[in-house]
Amino acid sequence: MVLCVQGPRPLLAVERTGQRPLWAPSLELPKPVMQPLPAGAFLEEVAEGTPAQTESEPKVLDPEEDLLCIAKTFSYLRESGWYWGSITASEARQHLQKMPEGTFLVRDSTHPSYLFTLSVKTTRGPTNVRIEYADSSFRLDSNCLSRPRILAFPDVVSLVQHYVASCTADTRSDSPDPAPTPALPMPKEDAPSDPALPAPPPATAVHLKLVQPFVRRSSARSLQHLCRLVINRLVADVDCLPLPRRMADYLRQYPFQL
């Protein structure tokens, strides 16, 4: 649709009086008087009157995507051998009490708002850190100030492997001041439920150091799985290996080094 506006012209006598005789013929305006507006002018007016949409629109949640992400994480954890299932914080403390610093395991969280908890032996004893899940990603629980700096991962095994590699690189670094490991708050699950257990120090943060997983005896890893771990540590892309399809599929089922 083309919009037209009437240009300036002198008023006729009948128009000055505001009356028009019935016998008066219809007036034909000269061509220059009727000037079409450019097509973009109307669009610009509409654009100016329409409020701009905010850039940070809420993300639409996809339950199917969440289900697939959580199912994949459970599959990886069962293959790992260091997923301990539904043990409590006290049981995890007993298992890790005599282990060297940096020994860790993953278990189900006792908090209804979390799926998993990372239990690790630190300089202050066994410590539990909850693992958050949001927007199809997992991250370590932390306070509000440091949360934007905490990395997110598509599954729990990728999360743990990242921090193990980070701690290993810091240990091997020749620099006098290696990059610090993430400082995380003491969650409520660390409060000892047994009065006989010693209470943790009143510090508010603990430096996380992950070195080696604590494999469950009932989930002893097979020789095939151990060979798969070695291949994953030595080869960046298993698709480049001249392997039978069945063996290549087995390697892809657990593409991790832990």
Curated annotation (Swiss-Prot):
Pathway: Protein modification; protein ubiquitination. One of its GO terms (biological process) is intracellular signal transduction. Induction: By a subset of cytokines including EPO/erythropoietin. GO terms for molecular function: cytokine receptor binding. Residues 209-257 form the SOCS box domain. It comes from the Eukaryota. Residues 82-163 form the SH2 domain. Residues 169-201 are annotated as: Disordered. Stably associated with the tyrosine-phosphorylated IL3 receptor beta chain and tyrosine-phosphorylated EPO receptor (EPOR). SOCS family proteins form part of a classical negative feedback system that regulates cytokine signal transduction. CIS is involved in the negative regulation of cytokines that signal through the JAK-STAT5 pathway such as erythropoietin, prolactin and interleukin 3 (IL3) receptor. Inhibits STAT5 trans-activation by suppressing its tyrosine phosphorylation. May be a substrate-recognition component of a SCF-like ECS (Elongin BC-CUL2/5-SOCS-box protein) E3 ubiquitin-protein ligase complex which mediates the ubiquitination and subsequent proteasomal degradation of target proteins. This is Cytokine-inducible SH2-containing protein. It comes from Homo sapiens. The gene is CISH.
